[in-house]
């Protein structure tokens, strides 16, 4: 997609600023790079990088990456993979790659995450018709389109009672006829 030299490709994006570049670059363990890994500070670019042999305690697994790094972990079973995810803070996104609909549905239904894709990445961000947002430490609320408006709006519920009418059955003592009368309107 970006050729043999993505750092030279004008269509390949860069990291947002020097501080974030340094943070993301610091997550790359050179001993675990199987693809990419090169970086150019002058243009704030980091090659798409795949890390293999990653352990849960590695730095790259301790925070959200927000960069072109894909850590690969190996699991013996779907149960092990699901437990790995659910035992940690809720991820911002989850990408499931499987042709098996049962596997897809299992992760979509039972694993908490902010948003995601099945057999793709990032595309849930690309439309203003779908909300995007995290849960827990990864943020709350939904952004994009109508969801942004709703998230950043505060809906206030107000009752404005007329002062000229005060119905006495609202107040104690609460006789059984008052309970019956109220239930007619409440239920």
Model features per residue range: what roles?
Residues 20-23, 77:
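An acidic site on a long C-lobe helix of protein kinase domains
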Residues 12, 45-187:
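Conserved C-terminal structural/oligomerization subdomain of aldehyde/semialdehyde dehydrogenase
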């Amino acid at each position: 997609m970006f050729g043999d030299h993505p750092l030279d490709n004008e269509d390949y994006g860069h990291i947002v600023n020097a501080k974030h570049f340094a943070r993301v670059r610091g997550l790359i363990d050179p001993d675990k790079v199987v693809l990419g890994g090169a970086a150019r500070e002058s243009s704030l670019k980091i090659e798409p990088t795949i890390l293999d042999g990653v352990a849960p305690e590695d730095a790259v697994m301790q925070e959200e990456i927000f960069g072109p790094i894909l850590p690969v972990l190996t699991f013996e079973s779907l149960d092990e993979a699901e437990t790995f995810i659910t035992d940690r803070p809720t991820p911002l996104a989850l990408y499931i790659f499987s042709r098996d609909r049962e596997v897809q549905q299992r992760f979509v239904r039972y694993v908490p995450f902010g948003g995601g894709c099945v057999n793709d990445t990032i595309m849930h961000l690309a439309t203003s018709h779908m909300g995007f947002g995290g849960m827990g430490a990864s943020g709350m609320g939904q952004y994009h389109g109508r969801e942004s408006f709703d998230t950043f709006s505060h809906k206030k519920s107000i009752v404005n009672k007329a002062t000229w009418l005060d119905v006495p059955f609202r107040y104690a003592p609460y006789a059984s006829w008052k309970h019956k009368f109220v239930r007619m309107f409440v239920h």
